[in-house]
A protein has these predicted regions:
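Short secondary-structure boundary/hinge segments and terminal tails
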Residues: 13-14, 85, 125
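His/Asp/Glu-enriched, well-ordered alpha-helical/loop segment
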Residues: 1-81
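C-terminal cap of metal-dependent C-N hydrolases
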Residues: 69-119
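Intein/HINT protein-splicing elements and their conserved insertion hotspots or analogous self-processing inserts
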Residues: 117-127
Length: 127
C-alpha cells in the first residue's frame, strides 16, 4: 500500500503542505499511544511522503535528483526573529511547524518561476 501526504482541501482543511505534514506526525503519535507495534511518523518521514513519496503517483517529482521536475519553494526563515543560529535542517523544521506563506519568497513548478499569488495583498511580516 503506497501512502503519501497531499493537500487535497476536500479531504482536509488547508492546502499548506507543511501543516499537513505536521498534522500527520501529530496524528501518528496519538495512534502510537494506542498501537505500540506501529511507531509514530518522524518529520523526515513526513517530509519524504509529502515530496518524493508523491512521485509514486505523479512521476518524477519531489526530488532535486537529475531527471526530476524542478518543483520547489524558496523559504526564508531569517525573518522569524530567532535568538539562535540554526542549521538548514533546523530551519526546515521551523518552517514546517511555524512557517506560512510569508516565509515563501519564490515558487517553482516544472522549472518555471511562478508569480506571487495575490501580490496586491500585503501581509504583516513576522518577527
Amino acid at each position: 500500500l503506497n501512502c503519501v501526504i497531499a493537500s487535497d482541501v476536500a479531504g482536509g482543511h488547508t492546502p499548506a503542505m507543511n501543516q499537513n505534514a505536521v498534522m500527520s506526525v501529530e496524528i501518528s503519535k496519538i495512534n502510537a499511544l494506542f498501537h505500540e507495534d506501529e511507531p509514530a511518523l518522524s518529520l523526515p518521514e513526513a517530509f519524504y511522503l509529502a515530496t518524493k513519496g508523491v512521485g509514486t503517483f505523479w512521476g518524477k517529482v519531489g526530488s532535486f535528483e537529475s531527471g526530476y521536475e524542478f518543483d520547489a519553494l524558496v523559504i526564508d526563515m531569517d525573518e522569524m526573529g530567532d535568538l539562535f543560529v540554526r542549521t538548514v535542517t533546523e530551519k526546515l523544521e521551523q518552517f514546517f511547524y511555524d512557517g506560512d506563506d510569508r516565509n515563501i519568497i519564490d515558487r517553482y513548478c516544472q522549472g518555471k518561476q511562478l508569480p506571487k499569488p495575490f501580490p496586491e495583498v500585503e501581509r504583516v511580516k513576522k518577527g
